[in-house]
A protein has these predicted regions:
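Adenylate-forming
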Residues: 1-167
Length: 167
């Protein structure tokens, strides 16, 4: 099974499945675009403060994770680069995306996001899987979006050994 094999590879390389899939996606983007720097937006739960842990609400922040490629970049080295980048980004997950944009002052355009045009979202639960709580049943609803926020969005869903994706 592909999901199990990818998890085993991630474990052998000392990375998470998220990191392995992100590195693979960034490699694909690099191969198609030829760009030596690939930046991908990644949503993060942003619930590091004790006072928000028990609140119901949308506290998601966006991080920008960059991978650098050259002619000699091996995939195992890229995995370690992505691991370092992801772990270092965790230390700054409380920095609001808007403040990051203000500090970096990139060239702005109404046609695209200022720091990245590709989003990657990995979820550790089954897609559409119902959640049961005492006296409460929660179920994910499919939401059709008529507009695209980014040029490309990859969503991956991990449930047990199963792995699914949508682009």
């Amino acid at each position: 099974d592909l999901g199990r094999s990818l998890k085993q590879l991630a474990q052998q390389q000392g990375v998470t499945l998220f990191m392995l899939l992100l590195a693979s996606f960034q490699t694909l983007l690099h191969r198609y675009s030829g760009q030596p720097e690939i930046r991908v937006g990644v949503p993060i739960a942003n619930r590091t403060r004790v006072e928000t842990e028990r609140l119901i609400g949308f506290f998601v922040n966006t991080q920008v994770l960059k991978a650098d490629f050259d002619l000699e970049t091996r995939f195992d080295a890229l995995l370690q680069q992505v691991k370092r980048t992801a772990l270092e980004a965790q230390a700054h997950q409380d920095l609001p995306f808007e403040q990051l944009v203000e500090a970096l002052q990139p060239q702005r355009s109404l046609s695209h996001s200022p720091l990245f045009q590709v989003m990657y979202n990995h979820q550790n639960a089954g897609q559409g899987k119902a959640l049961e709580l005492p006296g409460l049943r929660v179920e994910a609803l499919e939401r059709a979006s008529a507009t695209a926020q980014f040029d490309l969005t990859l969503d991956t869903y991990e449930s047990g050994d199963a792995l699914s994706a949508s682009l």
